């Protein structure tokens, strides 16, 4: 049987980090087994579902590179199918109409609680065989089996057993004419041939209810894999403040999509002690059965380390567009400075994120207006005009502007003055960047461009008072 998985977010908010991991594991499992991955949008909550959230989910999936073979499929476009299946259950005596008011339902629950029983529907309409009537309280309820036990072997959690006596006759169609979650997902997964349902363990309690519906429909029951939640660094439930933010905020924070993918893959799954994986390695090695049953903790330092690895090792040309995105967010005119790929080469050993890289790179795209006063006092003092002047002279004479030609000119300047390279580099670094910290001096000067470098040296000479 061909493996088919699905990711089925509700568009009531953005795709957060937990949802992204679920999508990744569903995608990896399908790809690992040579199967198909389906994207379904569970938008039957009409009050909370928004087009903005749908667009954000699709954008995040695209940014992460999680392509789907089918979809997006929208539940709101399948209501007629849900009605058809509900009517089938009604005709077979496996579901029934009920018309209790909210007050009557509240009274049932209160009576159960007074007896120290679980608050739930008491099955009052179960055997009444009530006909359809136009009523604002009309619902369709599923006849849950009265006796026996629901047993399933979760691919992550192991064997789980729940007595049917713990379950009531749940509503499968609401008064507004829309299906409930537990009913719609069963019909969807049945129709779509889903073989493995991979989702968060907050859905474990839904699973026995859904299995009973599958069996009532004589539909094949898929395998289930319930992943533990992701905790924050203190071991508490994730919040927006501690990492549960919109996935696209990780893009804005300067993380590479494949770095986030690598990190999320390891957030609950492992292959020995290996930390870094190519996409092909993930596809070859991932098996949902190997996902840990214990909750994973978010570790932003580890994510930073993974991201820095890819900043250091990826082709600079592939990183450049993402650096340009970060620079644009800072209001930088990219055309006013060096090629982004050259900036990547210069800075990637010094930062963990593209946001940091962009912030450091601004100096090469905008006029230098401020200087670190401590750096000026130390390196642009009287006497610094000598190495600066010689460097300017030789840089102005460079034929083809490159890191190599700049490096040669600066070494020639140091040799001509019989100075160590640091005596040339440090005043030049302050002249170009306004600070005493920057990448290799040849890269620093090269990125300023010939005209920009000469202008900044001239400004430094004026500052020294030796122009």
Swiss-Prot record:
UniProt-listed Gene3D superfamilies: 1.10.10.350, HUPs
EC number from the UniProt entry: 6.1.1.17
Localization annotation: Cytoplasm
Keywords: Aminoacyl-tRNA synthetase, ATP-binding, Cytoplasm, Ligase, Nucleotide-binding, Protein biosynthesis
Motif mapping: 'HIGH' region: 9-19
Pfam families the UniProt entry points to: Anticodon_2, tRNA-synt_1c
GO biological process: glutamyl-tRNA aminoacylation
Similarity-based family: Belongs to the class-I aminoacyl-tRNA synthetase family. Glutamate--tRNA ligase type 1 subfamily.
Function, in words: Catalyzes the attachment of glutamate to tRNA(Glu) in a two-step reaction: glutamate is first activated by ATP to form Glu-AMP and then transferred to the acceptor end of tRNA(Glu).
Oligomer and partners: Monomer.
Protein name: Glutamate--tRNA ligase
Originating organism: Xanthomonas axonopodis pv. citri (strain 306)
Lineage: Bacteria, Pseudomonadati, Pseudomonadota, Gammaproteobacteria, Lysobacterales
Record gene name: gltX
């Amino acid at each position: 049987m061909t493996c088919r998985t699905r990711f089925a977010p509700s568009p009531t908010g953005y795709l957060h980090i937990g949802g992204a991991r679920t999508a990744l594991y569903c995608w990896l499992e399908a790809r690992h087994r040579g199967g198909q991955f389906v994207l379904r949008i569970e938008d039957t909550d009409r009050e909370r579902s928004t087009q903005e959230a749908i667009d954000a989910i699709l954008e995040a999936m695209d940014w992460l590179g999680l392509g789907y073979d089918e979809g997006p499929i929208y539940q709101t476009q399948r209501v007629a199918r849900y009605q058809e299946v509900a009517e089938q259950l009604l005709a077979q005596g496996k579901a029934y109409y009920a018309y209790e008011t909210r007050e009557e339902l509240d009274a049932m629950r209160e009576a159960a609680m007074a007896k120290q029983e679980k608050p739930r529907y008491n099955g009052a309409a179960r055997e009444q065989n009530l006909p359809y009537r136009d009523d604002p309280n009309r619902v369709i309820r599923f006849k849950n089996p009265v006796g026996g036990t629901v047993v399933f072997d979760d691919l992550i959690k192991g064997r789980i057993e729940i007595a049917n006596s713990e379950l009531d006759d749940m509503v499968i169609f609401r008064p507004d004419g829309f299906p409930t979650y537990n009913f719609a997902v069963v019909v969807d997964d049945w129709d779509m041939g889903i073989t493995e349902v991979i989702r968060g363990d907050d859905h474990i309690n839904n699973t026995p209810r859904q299995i009973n519906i599958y069996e009532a429909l004589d539909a094949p029951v898929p395998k289930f894999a319930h992943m533990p939640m992701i905790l924050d660094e203190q071991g508490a439930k994730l919040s927006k403040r501690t990492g549960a933010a919109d996935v696209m905020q990780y893009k804005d924070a300067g993380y590479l999509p494949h770095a986030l993918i690598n990190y999320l893959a390891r957030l609950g799954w492992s292959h020995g002690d290996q930390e870094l994986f190519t996409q092909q390695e993930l596809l070859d090695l991932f098996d949902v059965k190997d996902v840990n049953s214990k909750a994973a903790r978010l570790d932003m330092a580890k994510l930073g380390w993974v991201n820095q690895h890819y900043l250091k090792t990826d082709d600079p040309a592939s990183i450049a567009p993402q650096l340009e995105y970060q620079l644009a967010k800072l209001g930088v005119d990219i055309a006013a400075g060096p090629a982004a790929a050259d900036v990547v080469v210069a800075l990637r050993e010094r930062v963990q994120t593209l946001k940091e890289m962009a912030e450091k790179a601004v100096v090469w795209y905008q006029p230098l207006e401020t200087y670190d006063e401590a750096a000026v006092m130390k390196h642009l003092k009287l006497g610094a005009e000598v190495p600066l002047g010689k460097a300017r002279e030789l840089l102005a004479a460079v034929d083809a502007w490159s890191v190599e030609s700049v490096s040669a000119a600066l070494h020639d300047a140091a040799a001509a003055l019989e100075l160590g390279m640091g005596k040339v580099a440090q005043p030049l670094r302050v002249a170009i960047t306004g600070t005493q910290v920057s990448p290799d001096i040849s890269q620093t000067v090269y990125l300023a461009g010939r005209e920009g470098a000469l202008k900044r040296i001239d400004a430094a000479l004026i500052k020294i008072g030796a122009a």
